[in-house]
Amino acid sequence: MTAILERRESERLWGRFCNWITSTENRLYIGWFGVLMIPTLLTATSVFIIAFIAAPPVDIDGIREPVSGSLLYGNNIISGAIIPTSAAIGLHFYPIWEAASVDEWLYNGGPYELIVLHFLLGVACYMGREWELSFRLGMRPWIAVAYSAPVAAATAVFLIYPIGQGSFSDGMPLGISGTFNFMIVFQAEHNILMHPFHMLGVAGVFGGSLFSAMHGSLVTSSLIRETTENESANAGYRFGQEEETYNIVAAHGYFGRLIFQYASFNNSRSLHFFLAAWPVVGIWFTALGISTMAFNLNGFNFNQSVVDSQGRVINTWADIINRANLGMEVMHERNAHNFPLDLAAIEAPSTNG
């Protein structure tokens, strides 16, 4: 009898917990994805803050020349970063218990792997939580689909690219200058500026910014005034009202006369779908481009592609970019190797005369 009562009590507790977790009445929705999201993001955030402030230098290249990244070791907000896990570790799973000591774990850049893996799991769960809340509210799932673009980009940079290159040391450092360094090295090694998927991503990001600014300014400029000229237009609206707050016909007419008739949308749904889809598809392509370049399927190479009738090279912009790439690659990991591979592979000229 006692066992039955205890089981019923535990079932009631579990049922109450389930109802609380999945309740849409909470100030912040938790959901089952949130059960995993909260601890993973808290772990990633707390370790990032501690490591950014106090982590010792990391032997990123695996050549016993540690690189400092934390504030207490001489960096500032701009130059500071979480240094990626050492090349000596490669792609091995490297939790604290795999190292001989905490000092060794820190020296080999263990915090980077810990932060990145928890962060990726956390943002994936955040995306799942968006879908879960939409489902429980009877909404369509497109919010989570849109969020999949930055999740895909982060996964490509922090996970797919290191896998393709064979080491977490090739991942993006977690800092401002570290991000720029990653971008420069990526251009030097993969010629990303000449990759069509990156071009689509640039069009998506900048085009999305342009369209968002155009839409916001058009809506703000075509509000339906419910007040007198002496009152603020904002005073004529209440949150959640059923009536339209702006005149889409007026906005459509204005934009059609500004450019041409068919350059503007007269359907609100198709307009907002376009505003969402343009940057999302662009960022999807960027993530796909990073993932292909991770396995060295690089941008187009048009080096020395134009020659005159005598066979002499006529330099193009592609050749200028190639020279810049070589210079950036020489500067990269200057202690790990003397020359980039494409320079070192060239046969040296004879010195015998």
Swiss-Prot record:
Biological process according to GO: photosynthetic electron transport in photosystem II; response to herbicide
Binding positions ([CaMn4O5] cluster): 170, 189, 332-333, 342, 344
Reactions mediated catalytically: 2 a plastoquinone + 4 hnu + 2 H2O = 2 a plastoquinol + O2
Annotated site residue numbers, Tyrosine radical intermediate: 161
Amino-acid positions noted as binding chlorophyll a ChlzD1 in the UniProt annotation, renumbered to this chain: 118
Binding, chlorophyll a PD1: 198
Enzyme's top EC category: oxidoreductase
Pfam family, one: Photo_RC
Matching InterPro entries: D1/D2, Photo_II_D1/D2_sf, Photo_RC_L/M, Photo_RC_L/M_CS, PSII_D1
UniProt site (Cleavage): 344-345
Post-translational modification N-acetylthreonine, affected residues: 2
SUBUNIT field: PSII is composed of 1 copy each of membrane proteins PsbA, PsbB, PsbC, PsbD, PsbE, PsbF, PsbH, PsbI, PsbJ, PsbK, PsbL, PsbM, PsbT, PsbX, PsbY, PsbZ, Psb30/Ycf12, at least 3 peripheral proteins of the oxygen-evolving complex and a large number of cofactors. It forms dimeric complexes.
The name this protein goes by in its record: Photosystem II protein D1
Species of provenance: Citrus sinensis
